[in-house]
Amino acid sequence: MIIRSPEPEVKILVDRDPIKTSFEEWAKPGHFSRTIAKGPDTTTWIWNLHADAHDFDSHTNDLEEISRKVFSAHFGQLSIIFLWLSGMYFHGARFSNYEAWLSDPTHIGPSAQVVWPIVGQEILNGDVGGGFRGIQITSGFFQIWRASGITSELQLYCTAIGALVFAALMLFAGWFHYHKAAPKLAWFQDVESMLNHHLAGLLGLGSLSWAGHQVHVSLPINQFLNAGVDPKEIPLPHEFILNRDLLAQLYPSFAEGATPFFTLNWSKYAEFLTFRGGLDPVTGGLWLTDIAHHHLAIAILFLIAGHMYRTNWGIGHGIKDILEAHKGPFTGQGHKGLYEILTTSWHAQLSLNLAMLGSLTIVVAHHMYSMPPYPYLATDYGTQLSLFTHHMWIGGFLIVGAAAHAAIFMVRDYDPTTRYNDLLDRVLRHRDAIISHLNWVCIFLGFHSFGLYIHNDTMSALGRPQDMFSDTAIQLQPVFAQWIQNTHALAPAATAPGATASTSLTWGGGDLVAVGGKVALLPIPLGTADFLVHHIHAFTIHVTVLILLKGVLFARSSRLIPDKANLGFRFPCDGPGRGGTCQVSAWDHVFLGLFWMYNAISVVIFHFSWKMQSDVWGSISDQGVVTHITGGNFAQSSITINGWLRDFLWAQASQVIQSYGSSLSAYGLFFLGAHFVWAFSLMFLFSGRGYWQELIESIVWAHNKLKVAPATQPRALSIVQGRAVGVTHYLLGGIATTWAFFLARIIAVG
């Protein structure tokens, strides 16, 4: 007789038709809130409507319903992303010079926008080469398209249509999974299954399919393009996929098919899965064969990772067990209880994800220039500068968002009665030590980093260059950074015996790659000037962390306001009669943190922009002499505050200031307009609510006199609303000003 264990029952993980589809609610603004649904008495109503529309926590306490709304909203977000992507590809297909650029990427600039001549606007269409007049773009799309093997505008059209189909599909999915088959809470909390599917499916199979595309489509097409074959003569992607002989002509080992794979004779594939390092001298990008190898390796790692967690079969890791076992001799209960936090608080979950994604985005910024992945990206200086700046800003915003949601978690989801002596509780109990030490570090870094500059400015003003900190007087060499550079430069043939070149030319070793007479990349020297500005980076980052971390650790209570948790995430002050308690809410810490994030990222992108123009980017003569854009002035000029103002901001702003009447004039107008937006923010940040209320009341009086007073009573912005409008315009104005300054400069000289 055979005894069988009972079959595990299949869990029903969705509710059918939970909420009927109706457009009636769309006609009722604020249907999610009793107060807002009543309609406006005062103008504050419209602000509250916007503040709470997406705050699902405030609509209901039911975690399952909140989860479904978030899940459905994600499909809406994906739909918008597909729509945007489709628009990018459509512009490439309809308005761009992509095919011309593909035939001569060193002399023709990428353009995918032509301005209609209405009243003189055609001035914006500059000559980008090859007889095409349009706006030079710096998004890097052309380079990505070439790397992926797109050779015609028809292919871009097809991809654009495909993205539209996916956008529609995502909208449908968002509706379907909220109204027709909505997942139960248990489904959202099944972390092992989620990990397996995301790791093996998204990252594993995603990387594998990309590696497959690169091997079967990108590599052969790029091989032909690099050899100078006319794009129209190159076989189409499906021909390479269906006809193995075509590929075998380029890579002979293809003739053997999968035999080497199954006989473990993998070295046969070394023709198209390489480990070379360095850059392809033809395109100035990473070797595409290295990139294909990389994606294959990543795919294998994540396919393994996606089979590690325990689901229906009772084998593998359980996240709860891992977290509860994770405790050391000095950490009390360790991560006990963290599993419950992360499966019931989506704010805690989001906070971790934002912190990691933000850090990763900044890592991407640094790799895009030091290991340029796409062909002809490294010599397109405008695109290089744009990609670095863009990824730095995005990373900064995501990290501030991490602190914001950590604080919301503390206020809304943290239950102090169930937490004792785990890591989070221990951190909260010695938060005073953490914050006061961090504060000391900030003061130390601030005085010392800035003090080095002030010393140099003073010595410079007094005519004592021999007493300055510089590479030619008192040297402060970044010896640790130089040691790391050197280690990596020496790695090929030593610690990395298989590689023919180091991972990045920036490490050193004397190699230089130039494409079409322009420098793609060369070893980046680090000296006293970099040492000084790196300490400014350390200072601004630590202050940002101080503000954000204080906001999180004191989100629920402080000596000043012991019952802060009852006041919520954002509140102006602790009520009347308690002076000196304004601007202490967790929201206010996020508000203040944003300004320091802006400071931190600004210094980083200024450093990058000047350093690259001074020491990397430039032209190379037939004799091999490199002439940099600003002639290597970074090392001696950036060591004083005056140098930054005079030789960077002022000297390099000449292009944007003098852009009027040229094809760059739009940048001049943006430069002016964005300064205005920035200045407009100060009106909200520097004046109080009462000032505006008084002004409004006299304006209302005038309207009453003329019998044109509105039914909705005008109100001044609340304190929090005013600060929100202020910081938004401050950041928007500042970022757009920087954008116009950078692009006018680099398009003119690059």
Curated annotation (Swiss-Prot):
EC top class named in words: oxidoreductase
One GO CC term, this protein: photosystem I
SUPFAM superfamilies cross-referenced by the UniProt entry: Photosystem I subunits PsaA/PsaB
Reaction equations catalysed: reduced [plastocyanin] + hnu + oxidized [2Fe-2S]-[ferredoxin] = oxidized [plastocyanin] + reduced [2Fe-2S]-[ferredoxin]
Signal peptide: none
Residues annotated as binding phylloquinone: W692
Keyword Cell inner membrane: no
Binding site for chlorophyll a': H675
Subcellular location: Plastid, Chloroplast thylakoid membrane
Transmembrane feature ranges: 70-93, 156-179, 195-219, 291-309, 346-369, 385-411, 433-455, 531-549, 589-610, 664-686, 724-744
Positions contributing to chlorophyll a binding: M683, Y691
Cofactor binding remark: P700 is a chlorophyll a/chlorophyll a' dimer, A0 is one or more chlorophyll a, A1 is one or both phylloquinones and FX is a shared 4Fe-4S iron-sulfur center.
Bilayer disposition of the protein: Multi-pass membrane protein
Residue pairs linked by disulfide bridges in the UniProt entry: none
Family annotation (Pfam families): PsaA_PsaB (PF00223)
Keywords: 4Fe-4S, Chlorophyll, Chloroplast, Chromophore, Electron transport, Iron, Iron-sulfur, Magnesium, Membrane, Metal-binding, Oxidoreductase, Photosynthesis, Photosystem I, Plastid, Thylakoid, Transmembrane, Transmembrane helix, Transport
Entry's EC annotation: 1.97.1.12
Chain sites annotated for binding [4Fe-4S] cluster: C573, C582
NCBIfam families: psaA
HAMAP family linked to this entry: PSI_PsaA (MF_00458)
Family: Belongs to the PsaA/PsaB family.
Assembly description: The PsaA/B heterodimer binds the P700 chlorophyll special pair and subsequent electron acceptors. PSI consists of a core antenna complex that captures photons, and an electron transfer chain that converts photonic excitation into a charge separation. The eukaryotic PSI reaction center is composed of at least 11 subunits.
Name of the protein described by the UniProt record: Photosystem I P700 chlorophyll a apoprotein A1
Lineage, opening ranks: Eukaryota, Viridiplantae, Streptophyta, Embryophyta, Tracheophyta
